[in-house]
Amino acid sequence: MTILPFLAAVFVLQLLSTLTVAEIKSFTISNDSRPVILLEKFGIIEIGHVTVSVSSVSVLSPILDSSKLGFFVLSEESLPHVLLELQQNFSFCVLDSHYILHFFTFVDLSPPPRSQFSKSYPITSPNDYSLFFANCVPETRVSMKVHTEIYHDLYPNGSRDYLLAGSAQLPGLYLVFFLCYLSFLCFWLCFCWNHKQIVKRIHLLMTALLLVKSLTLICAAVYKHYVKVTGTAHGWNIVFYIFQFISVVLLFMVIVLIGNGWSFLKPKLHVKEKKLLVIVVPLQVLANIASIVIGETGPYTQDWVSWNQIFFLADITCCCAIVFAMVWSMCCLRETSKTDGKAVKNLAKLPVLRKFYVLVIGYLFFTRIVVVVMKMKADFTYQWVSNAAEEIATLSFYCLMFYMFRPIEKNEYCDVDDEEEIVELSLK
């Protein structure tokens, strides 16, 4: 095994592994020739177990050496030592290292046609671990069915906790934020009811956004609870992905519509705003599809890194399109006021627009950049902190946005004299 494939796998591990979840998983590896395959990343804070079962193993190789094909667990502390061994000898097989937790090799497999084996390994040292499959035989392709179970033995009665270090707090965290959003929704509904004479269409869309966000969080809490207790989601992952998809698309639609003054400054969207929606919505659809694929598979999938790249590019492109449209819209409004007398008095609305644009840019920067850095840098026992930071930032953004554009009579952003002025103010 050369050092380059192993370094590539380690790089992917450090960059993207916060997206993997330690639970019960079953997957198939088909005709794969990769020298090393990252199967799972997990953290253990007390006594834990790793169980790996393989079946229907098939190997295509010109020179078969079953002892050079197998599974191992590598701790974060041992990683530098293994890299040093590979640097000193490029042909060194990582399965021969003294720094790994050796699981089993294909020598242990039962005879064909079943070709299966299962082993459970106790882990008693708290650390950040990674489960790998190594193929040290050149030009060898492997196909097999793999079943993994990773859990904590926390209770004397033998019950298991499948949400490992850094994720065990997620069910309670999502439940708390669900209650926050539910209270927010009730307050918003009461406020809109008391001001129903001036409620606009955008306020109805904002109400739908709050409702779907609340449902997303309660589904996330139930989803993580079932994974924690049983190791599987029992279908709640599908419900969660549906509401998450609707929530994200609604959020970006609300941002675009508010930023362009729909139902506040003008009764309908113009061509440029419609084009922006045509760009933003499909990009978010693509990003959500990529997010689902990433969440439901893992680094053992050959195109997993590509899906991560698709998610990142689609999401960042969408955010950049929104920021560019906001800045361009403000510049156009400022230039229009120099030649249009009726538009001059509406420059008073620019400070409010500017505040909203700064709020959006700050929110996008924090959730897309700062949170990702937190996930990469945080200790494995504090991975949940990045989730908490993201939810706090999102709730704060919602509160400020809803406060700025609440349905009141004297709203400096919504106060427009008449429909004729609205049409003249519209950016063509």
From Swiss-Prot:
It is found in: Membrane. One of its GO terms (biological process) is G protein-coupled receptor signaling pathway. The chain crosses the membrane at residues 173-193, 202-222, 238-258, 276-296, 310-330, 356-376, 385-405. The keyword Glycoprotein applies. Glycans are attached at N31, N89, N157. GO terms for cellular component: membrane. Keywords: G-protein coupled receptor, Glycoprotein, Membrane, Receptor, Signal, Transducer, Transmembrane, Transmembrane helix. It holds the Pfam family CAND6-7_N. Its main location: membrane. It is a multi-pass membrane protein. It comes from the Eukaryota. Residues 1-22 form the signal peptide. GO terms for molecular function: G protein-coupled receptor activity. Belongs to the LU7TM family. G-protein coupled receptor. Plays a role in plants and microbes interactions. This is Protein CANDIDATE G-PROTEIN COUPLED RECEPTOR 6. It comes from Arabidopsis thaliana (Mouse-ear cress).
